[in-house]
Amino acid sequence: NPSSRFDLRLEPTRRFIEQPFSNHNGGHLAFGPDGYLYIGLGDGGSGNDPDHLAQTPAELLGKMLRIDVNVPNEDASGYRIPPDNPFLGGNSARDEIWAFGLRNPWRYTFDDVTRGGTGAMVIGDVGQNRFEEINYEPRGRSGRNYGWRNREGAHDNVTNRPLAYGPPTDPIFDYGRSDGVSVTGGFIYRGTRLGAAHRGRYFFADYSGRVWSL
């Protein structure tokens, strides 16, 4: 936002989330059309989420978080919980959680409402070794469980421990390792130069170099 101003003299507020392994960090932040900050976190790393963190309500890893960072400078926490977060005030799940069951969300986008979009969120979630997936979340549809580690794509994976809650929400699209190796989420096209046939389509890529649209 070109009108934003930052005061570098302010003491930075830091929040740390312990990562048990070095991979699956998520690594993406995005503001939604509601003005809240969405934070996609991976499951903490290693293979097949050995501690089942993406399905553990008391853990932030393997989740999509949603927070309000529009707080006064003197607010020591640095953020607040939006009043309509789905698990706010619950007995077990963390208040910051918006959705469960992500392995390594890389990356996600919101359908731009200023250009005729719906405000929906689309998430590219990197798979373990069989399937890459694209998850679609209509605007405001909170509290979903995208299934990892019990599900990889729309397929059963490691099921010896239960989902935090169900039923899981399957992806709108998944693909196997014969087509790619690691999804990179993209954007819903709302421009005009590519023609009307491409408007509203979701463009995404894979580490192998391929680009698709849905």
Language model features by range: what are they?
Residues N25-G44, G62-K63:
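Aromatic- and glycine-enriched pocket-lining scaffold segments that form the walls
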Residues D43-L214:
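Beta-propeller domain segments
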Residues T13, D34-L37, G117-G119, G200:
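Loop/turn elements at helix/coil->beta-strand transitions in domains of secreted/extracellular proteins
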Residues N1-A30:
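Asp-box/WD-like beta-propeller blade repeats and closely related beta-sheet repeat scaffolds
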